[in-house]
Each structure stands twice: as C-alpha cells, then as structure tokens.
C-alpha cells in the first residue's frame, strides 16, 4: 500500500512541474542532435536498452570516432543517419526534479525551413548552435530571424566545439559580440550565451573546469531556471468557442481553450461578432467547477443569459476587445510544394474560425539569409513574405507579437486540403490602403428593406451557407 501511495505522490508532484518547450537550430554539423543526446545521456534519462542500441549504432553508423555518437538518439530516419543530418523534426521528452521538457530538434538546411517553423511554433525557448571555429554564419542569422518571426522570447546561443579552439575566452567573446550586434534589431528580449562542448559534455549538464573564465550557468541549469510564466498573455481574455455542449435541455455550455487572459465566475463577457453581453455563470471541467481559468486550460463556460454563440465565435471582456476586421497584414511562410497562385481563394483557419480569404498583394519577400527585401509575384516552398489579406467574414485577432494564439493562422487549399501556408498577423489594414475592390457578395439588409427583427434569422441562414463554403457578407 505504501508503494502505491509513493507512486501516486510522485505522479502528483510530476504533474505540477511546469513544462518548457524548446527547439534547437543550427547549421549542418554544428552538433544539435549531439547536444540533445548528450543532455539526455548526462542527465541519466536513457534506459539500458537505449544505451546498448546507442553503443552498437555508434560503432556501425557513428561519425564521432571512438566516442559514442549521441546524435543517433535523435536522427531516426534512415536518410538522416546515412547523410548525418536532421531532416524531420525529432521530438524528445524528459524531465528533471524541477521541470519537464519537450525538445524539438529541427533541421538546419534551408530547404527544410517549413519543418523548423512547425517545430518552433509552440516553443518557449530556442537553442541556436554555432561552431566555435566558424562563428556566426549565414545559417545562424537565418535561424535567428525565424526564431524572432515565431515570437520566441528566450534564445540561448550555444557556442559548441569549444574544445577545438582550446576553450578560448577571446574567441567566445568575439562570437558573442558579433551575434548580439546582429540580434539587437530583431527585438528578442532574452539572449544568453554559453560556451560548451557537446561531445565531451562541457557546460552541458555540469559546469566545466575547462572554462574557469565563464561565470554563467551550465545549459541544463539555465533551462531549469529560465522564467517563462510571464511569456503568457494574462491580460487580454480571448475564448474562441470550439463546441456548444447541450447534453440536455437544462445545460448549455461553450467549450474551448482559454487562448489568453483570465476568466472568473461572474465576469461580464461579450460574444463576437454579435456584441451580445452576459455574465459567466460557471466554469466547468471534467474534475469539477473552477472559480477562474487561464491559458492553456480547456473549460466549458456557461452564461447567465441565453445568447446565440456557435463555433468560430469568441467570448471576450467588453472593455478589452480584439481587432475585428476583414483586412490585415501578416508574415507568411509558404509551405506547399505548389507555388502560390495569387488569384486563388483559400480557406483561412484562425483560432476556431474558418473563412474564405484572398491574397490582395505581396508587399515584399524576405531573403532569410541576407534579410533583404524584394518584390515578387508569388511565393514558392519555404519562402517568407509580408502579405495583405482580405477575408469574406470578420476575424477576431490580435497582433502575433502580443498574442500568439489569436495572431496566428493557416491557409488551406480548398481543393487538396493541404496546409498551404502559416501566417503571423502584424496588424489590420485600413480599407483606404487596400488596392483591390471587394468582390465578396454582400447582403445590405437595410437597402433590401428587411426589418431588424428578421436579422438574426438571416444571419443563421448565412452562417449555414458559410459552413458549406459559400461566403456572403451581411451589412446592417
């Protein structure tokens, strides 16, 4: 019985640890996979069978000479092991006494930019590796730009292979100075630089005696203590409705994930786009009712009043509204093998909201290697650009830098259902700045002589058409 209680106590304690999601990025052969493998090895997070397999594979496939090739722990695809590179995003989970970790080992090659965007979309922190011999190179700048694009607030510059430059403090300081000069305009608030040797384990889990001049923490100590709670947006309440729960006539609740902000019982809320107002009656979960909820909790909200709210709509505080608009600018990463057709209409999915959208213009493409801007007629795979959109119906959004959950979206090809692109919203665009006429069909209800008491019924009919792919806008 005591053993069962001990197990339960351990699981309860483990459940309460906070979670740090991090990605690694770097050029080919900078040692990303080796670093993560070393982190798992030195923190005693490998099972006996994994260690046996690692030793066998190191002799047969390894690229580390007589050393164990820790990269083989993460390079799982046959093509990766044969080429000695990372292609897919490899995820690894481990935990320490203080924190749980999910590591995304992302590919360094430019042709796999979309894989890195996918791996970094949920990350709190990025580890960017550089080879101490090579210093800051083109790929370092590219990966740092992508990290800033994704809104990742914490970056560790891991200067690897310090053993090959005799753990030179002067060389380390040169690299740090060059990197900080580049990163300053990108607006990343927290940059930490650590000298290490992934192969030998210096400054990975424990402080190294070979860098007496380095006064900072080892990599694992830093990862365990970096403060990430303030990265969440707890001020702007946004609750995209995912599902309306109606198990019986006596209960009607709105299910979803709290995207940002805090909601409490009794709070006044507004439903968008209708603008109708009510108060929160209860916050329901599987484990019982809560007095308040915050991101990323999934809850069911019940309201004091019977107001019409459905999937794709949003509950917010009336005194703190998101931007409600059909026109906006965004940074777009093209992820489809097929090049962009600027005349094509797409589905846009933002939070739980889905609408038809068109691309009005490409302001400029960003060269991820040089940061130069250029004018282009379309985008190809892995290219990034600043793009202007118009949607068929209004979206409820915040700029991505302010609110990741409500400032991000995907474009879906209506024919193939492929995810064509991912986007990060910059801000709304005023209609006077739009250079293309609005060609979505419009129902102007006052002009048609329709009485206001019939508006709600017409809105429901139009919503039903929208779910079938027919977009019609209503003006009241």
From Swiss-Prot:
Pfam families, per database record: GTP-eEF1A_C (PF22594), GTP_EFTU (PF00009)
This protein's name: Sulfate adenylyltransferase subunit 1
Domain tr-type G: 17-232
Any one GO biological process: sulfate assimilation
Region spans: G5: 197-199
Reaction catalysis annotation: sulfate + ATP + H(+) = adenosine 5'-phosphosulfate + diphosphate
InterPro entries according to UniProt: CysN_GTP-bd, CysN_II, CysN_NoDQ_III, G_TR_CS, GTP-eEF1A_C, P-loop_NTPase, SO4_adenylTrfase_lsu, T_Tr_GTP-bd_dom
Enzyme class: transferase
NCBIfam families, A to Z: CysN, PRK05124.1
Keywords: ATP-binding, GTP-binding, Nucleotide-binding, Nucleotidyltransferase, Transferase
PROSITE patterns registered for this protein in UniProt: G_TR_1 (PS00301), G_TR_2 (PS51722)
